[in-house]
């Protein structure tokens, strides 16, 4: 059994290009299923039927696992059984069609346009300031994922065309435009840092790509230094990019392409943010909004 599980994770890593973070989550999910099977003495997980999987989901739910975590756990199980079917180890996928309780989707927190512009406009009178300005401007200008920004090398930056080429989820390559302010900041940082094609745009302490944790800590420090009340984190800049772009353009499909979302339903969360903003405008401005009739 352990060999099959190892082979499955090798498939996810090599053929599906799954990140180490996602692989760890999947290992926990499949591990939970195996542990439940042992505890219930129901045999090997390859032999579980649909009713037993439903019992597993119910047990996890009773244990207090959130709806979102349950959905991911079921997704891992579906993928595992689908792989077993494809390899001929079992005849049918017992997890196909199984559903977890629906998760309440939280709306992402964003900076408004004025907050975002104020935040990224930090002084550039030191090399560190040049780097930080370029990093923040690029985040907000192009809506990159944290992993994409950390892995970016100068060879993937076309300062003349105003484009960056990044490796997204599932090892999918995409090209995204860079705004004029971010381009200006990148040019200054390139001139200061050297900018060799194979060099990371944002190097870490030892010359390799900067770590995700280092970026998170730095953004938190910069936000605190500016006295911002909100807890600012890298993904908030990506959320802000998407929301502001959708608000001004209304082009959901275009925003999907720029963000690198494989499924447009992932992008649709930003339409709810836009509606939330419009609702606030209505409540504040309309003479009949939320007022008791006299």
From Swiss-Prot:
<dbReference type="InterPro" id="IPR050090">
    <property type="entry name" value="Tyrosine_recombinase_XerCD"/>
</dbReference>
<keyword id="KW-0131">Cell cycle</keyword>
<feature type="active site" description="O-(3'-phospho-DNA)-tyrosine intermediate">
    <location>
        <position position="270"/>
    </location>
</feature>
<comment type="function">
    <text>Site-specific tyrosine recombinase, which acts by catalyzing the cutting and rejoining of the recombining DNA molecules. The XerC-XerD complex is essential to convert dimers of the bacterial chromosome into monomers to permit their segregation at cell division. It also contributes to the segregational stability of plasmids.</text>
</comment>
<keyword id="KW-0238">DNA-binding</keyword>
<comment type="similarity">
    <text>Belongs to the 'phage' integrase family. XerC subfamily.</text>
</comment>
<feature type="active site">
    <location>
        <position position="238"/>
    </location>
</feature>
<dbReference type="InterPro" id="IPR011010">
    <property type="entry name" value="DNA_brk_join_enz"/>
</dbReference>
<dbReference type="GO" id="GO:0005737">
    <property type="term" value="C:cytoplasm"/>
</dbReference>
<dbReference type="InterPro" id="IPR010998">
    <property type="entry name" value="Integrase_recombinase_N"/>
</dbReference>
<dbReference type="InterPro" id="IPR002104">
    <property type="entry name" value="Integrase_catalytic"/>
</dbReference>
<feature type="active site">
    <location>
        <position position="235"/>
    </location>
</feature>
<dbReference type="GO" id="GO:0009037">
    <property type="term" value="F:tyrosine-based site-specific recombinase activity"/>
</dbReference>
<dbReference type="InterPro" id="IPR011931">
    <property type="entry name" value="Recomb_XerC"/>
</dbReference>
<keyword id="KW-0963">Cytoplasm</keyword>
<keyword id="KW-0229">DNA integration</keyword>
<feature type="active site">
    <location>
        <position position="261"/>
    </location>
</feature>
<dbReference type="Pfam" id="PF02899">
    <property type="entry name" value="Phage_int_SAM_1"/>
</dbReference>
<dbReference type="Pfam" id="PF00589">
    <property type="entry name" value="Phage_integrase"/>
</dbReference>
<feature type="domain" description="Tyr recombinase">
    <location>
        <begin position="106"/>
        <end position="283"/>
    </location>
</feature>
<dbReference type="GO" id="GO:0003677">
    <property type="term" value="F:DNA binding"/>
</dbReference>
<comment type="subunit">
    <text>Forms a cyclic heterotetrameric complex composed of two molecules of XerC and two molecules of XerD.</text>
</comment>
<keyword id="KW-0132">Cell division</keyword>
<dbReference type="GO" id="GO:0051301">
    <property type="term" value="P:cell division"/>
</dbReference>
<feature type="domain" description="Core-binding (CB)">
    <location>
        <begin position="1"/>
        <end position="85"/>
    </location>
</feature>
<feature type="active site">
    <location>
        <position position="145"/>
    </location>
</feature>
<keyword id="KW-0159">Chromosome partition</keyword>
<dbReference type="InterPro" id="IPR023009">
    <property type="entry name" value="Tyrosine_recombinase_XerC/XerD"/>
</dbReference>
<dbReference type="InterPro" id="IPR013762">
    <property type="entry name" value="Integrase-like_cat_sf"/>
</dbReference>
<protein>
    <recommendedName>
        <fullName>Tyrosine recombinase XerC</fullName>
    </recommendedName>
</protein>
<dbReference type="GO" id="GO:0007059">
    <property type="term" value="P:chromosome segregation"/>
</dbReference>
<dbReference type="InterPro" id="IPR044068">
    <property type="entry name" value="CB"/>
</dbReference>
<keyword id="KW-0233">DNA recombination</keyword>
<feature type="active site">
    <location>
        <position position="169"/>
    </location>
</feature>
<dbReference type="InterPro" id="IPR004107">
    <property type="entry name" value="Integrase_SAM-like_N"/>
</dbReference>
<dbReference type="GO" id="GO:0006313">
    <property type="term" value="P:DNA transposition"/>
</dbReference>
């Amino acid at each position: 059994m352990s060999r099959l599980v190892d082979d499955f994770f090798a498939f996810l890593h090599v053929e599906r290009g799954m990140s180490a973070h996602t692989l760890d989550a999947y290992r926990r999910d499949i591990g939970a299923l195996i542990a439940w099977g042992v505890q219930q003495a129901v045999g090997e997980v390859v032999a579980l039927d649909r009713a037993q999987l439903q019992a597993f989901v119910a047990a996890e739910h009773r244990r207090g696992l959130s709806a979102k975590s349950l959905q991911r756990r079921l997704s891992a199980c579906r993928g595992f059984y689908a792989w077993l079917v494809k390899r001929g180890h079992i005849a049918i996928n017992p997890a196909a069609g199984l559903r977890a309780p629906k998760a309440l989707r939280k709306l992402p927190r964003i900076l408004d346009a004025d907050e975002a512009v104020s935040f990224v406009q930090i002084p550039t009178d030191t090399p560190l300031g040049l780097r930080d300005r370029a990093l923040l401007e690029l985040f907000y200008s192009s809506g990159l994922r944290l992993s994409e920004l950390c892995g970016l090398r100068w060879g993937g930056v076309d300062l003349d065309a105003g484009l960056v080429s990044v490796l997204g989820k599932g090892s999918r390559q995409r090209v995204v435009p860079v705004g004029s302010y971010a381009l200006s900041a990148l040019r200054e940082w390139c001139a200061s840092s050297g900018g060799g094609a194979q060099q990371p745009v944002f190097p870490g302490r030892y010359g390799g790509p900067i770590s995700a944790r280092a970026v998170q800590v730095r953004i938190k420090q910069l936000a605190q230094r500016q006295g911002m009340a909100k807890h600012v984190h890298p993904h908030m800049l990506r959320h802000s990019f998407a929301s502001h772009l959708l608000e001004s353009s209304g082009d959901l499909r275009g925003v999907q392409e720029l963000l690198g979302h494989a499924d447009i339903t992932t992008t649709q969360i930003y339409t709810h943010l836009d509606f939330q903003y419009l609702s606030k405008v209505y409540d504040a401005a309309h003479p009949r909004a939320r007022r008791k009739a006299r």
